[in-house]
């Protein structure tokens, strides 16, 4: 894909001398020489700014790349990041690391500032072993260039770009995989270092090859390529020049521009003006139950009796009677998504519907005893008045009969008493007879004395 240059100053920046330590691809595919005046863009910077990209670096860390050389690659990545207009609405960057396996160091959605990206790059470790370049390109399509991983939708018209850095020959099939990637709209730049196979680089890269294939002799000068890529990604910045008609946000796009809106607004059909959106309108949010608008964005909440799940979208019914979730003094009874309080047996719920008080179990209406209620702590037993006995149901009473009041033991006692009483009576009668006889004899004696 041929790149339009923004201004005359930007064009002049391309025509710099060739570095002694680096050479271009073979003559029939030669690019403009790599410049020695790197980083000197002067006034061109004000009107020449890299256009928004979804940019993925795929770096070879196979066994042929020595540790000190891999550190040079990381320096190259950091310098590339410094030249980019990084941000959520501008250029997004991902880094993949490959050898015999592929590792996504960070996808497009992870970092939107240069400092965080460069810190993540500094922590990358080589994988060693083989050079599975085709596997890495396929992984970029399957695992990185997806909306879930931060790639912007097709209607945003943001270019998808891959920069592959390798020093060897691929050990797997790359031609078909690279062709599929290009067909999917991915622009591929191939950077060869040292022993890199030039034919493989040309097979991978997009057309025209003289704009998409780069070669340097050593990793020691790879960072010099940052200038070439900056020039490649440079576009006339209509947004910076202020010659656009966007109401809110202007986004540079491959020499042109697109209009966008602030968060909480949506672009109108005229593609220039914006209208505020109801982020909680049906179909605009992912909340399971309640959507709460929050400064152009939204947060999800749940109905009473439900709790928000870790995904911050869906809700689950909570156990409202779990410890710490209710204020019942004794018993919590779940009632749908709410609860009510109750009390243990022997207690009654107070008017506050939370606390409990002990009840008089023998108070009228609280027991089923027919005659006498006897309180026993929180419980009671029934009893009867004198002359009544408790029935087997332990509640009602029946009048006691005489026979039922005398036990066998008491009957024996009665017989013994009766016998004793008979014996005493008999003796008293005998004694009385004796006393009568003595009294008669005494009277007769007294009579005789009077006669004398």
UniProtKB/Swiss-Prot annotation:
Tissue and organ expression note: Expression is restricted to cartilaginous tissues.
Stretch forming the signal peptide: 1-24
UniProt-recorded name of the protein: Matrilin-3
Disulfide topology: 239-250, 246-259, 261-274, 280-291, 287-300, 302-315, 321-332, 328-341, 343-356, 362-373, 369-382, 384-397
Gene3D superfamilies (alphabetical): 1.20.5.30, Laminin (2.10.25.10), von Willebrand factor, type A domain (3.40.50.410)
Coiled-coil spans in chain: 419-451
PANTHER family associated with the record: COLLAGEN ALPHA (PTHR24020), MATRILIN-3 (PTHR24020:SF12)
Gene name, Swiss-Prot/TrEMBL: MATN3
Domain EGF-like: 235-275, 276-316, 317-357, 358-398
Record key words, sorted: Coiled coil, Disulfide bond, EGF-like domain, Glycoprotein, Repeat, Secreted, Signal
One Pfam family hit: FXa_inhibition
CC per GO annotation: collagen-containing extracellular matrix; extracellular region
Superkingdom of origin organism: Eukaryota
Carbohydrate-modified residues: 295
Main location: secreted
GO molecular function: calcium ion binding
Cellular localization per UniProt: Secreted
Span of domain VWFA: 54-229
Task performed by this protein: Major component of the extracellular matrix of cartilage and may play a role in the formation of extracellular filamentous networks.
Subunit structure: Can form homooligomers (monomers, dimers, trimers and tetramers) and heterooligomers with matrilin-1.
């Amino acid at each position: 894909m041929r790149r339009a240059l923004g201004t005359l100053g930007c064009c002049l920046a391309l025509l710099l001398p060739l570095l002694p330590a680096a050479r271009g691809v073979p003559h029939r595919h030669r690019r403009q020489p790599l410049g020695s005046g790197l980083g000197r863009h002067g006034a061109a910077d004000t009107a020449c700014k890299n256009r928004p990209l979804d940019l993925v670096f795929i770096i070879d860390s196979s066994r042929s790349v020595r540790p000190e050389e891999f550190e040079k690659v990381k320096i190259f990545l950091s310098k590339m990041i410094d030249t980019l207009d990084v941000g959520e609405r501008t250029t997004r960057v991902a880094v993949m690391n490959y050898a015999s396996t592929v590792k996504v160091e960070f996808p497009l959605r992870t970092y939107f500032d240069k400092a965080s990206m460069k810190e993540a790059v500094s922590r990358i470790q080589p994988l060693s072993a083989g050079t599975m370049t085709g596997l890495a390109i396929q992984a970029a399509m399957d695992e990185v260039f997806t909306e879930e991983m931060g790639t912007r939708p097709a209607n945003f018209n943001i270019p998808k770009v891959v920069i592959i850095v390798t020093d060897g020959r691929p050990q797997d099939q790359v031609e078909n995989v690279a062709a599929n990637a290009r067909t999917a709209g991915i622009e591929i730049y191939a950077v060869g270092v040292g022993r890199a196979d030039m034919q493989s680089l040309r097979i991978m890269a997009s057309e025209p090859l003289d704009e998409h294939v780069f070669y340097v002799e050593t990793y020691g000068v790879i960072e010099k390529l940052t200038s070439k890529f900056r020039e490649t990604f440079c576009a006339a910045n209509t947004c910076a020049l202020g010659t656009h008609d966007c109401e809110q946000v202007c986004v540079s796009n491959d020499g042109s521009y697109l209009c966008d809106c602030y968060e909480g607004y949506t672009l109108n059909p005229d593609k220039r003006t914006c209208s505020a959106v109801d982020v909680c309108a049906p179909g605009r949010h992912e909340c399971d139950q309640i959507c709460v608008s929050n400064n152009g964005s939204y947060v999800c909440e749940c109905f009473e009796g439900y709790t928000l799940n870790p995904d911050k979208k869906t809700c689950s019914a909570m156990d409202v009677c779990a410890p710490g979730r209710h204020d019942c003094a004794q018993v919590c009874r779940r009632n749908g998504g709410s609860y009510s309080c109750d009390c243990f047996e022997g207690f009654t719920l107070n008017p506050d519907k939370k606390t409990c008080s002990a009840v008089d179990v023998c108070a009228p209406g609280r027991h089923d005893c027919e005659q006498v209620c006897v309180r026993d702590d929180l419980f009671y037993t029934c009893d009867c008045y004198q002359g009544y006995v408790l029935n087997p149901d332990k509640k009602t009473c029946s009048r006691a009969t005489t026979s039922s009041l005398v036990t066998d033991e008491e009957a024996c006692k009665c017989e013994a008493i009766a016998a004793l009483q008979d014996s005493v009576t008999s003796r008293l009668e005998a004694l009385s007879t004796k006393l009568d006889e003595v009294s008669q004899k005494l009277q007769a004696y007294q009579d005789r004395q009077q006669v004398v």
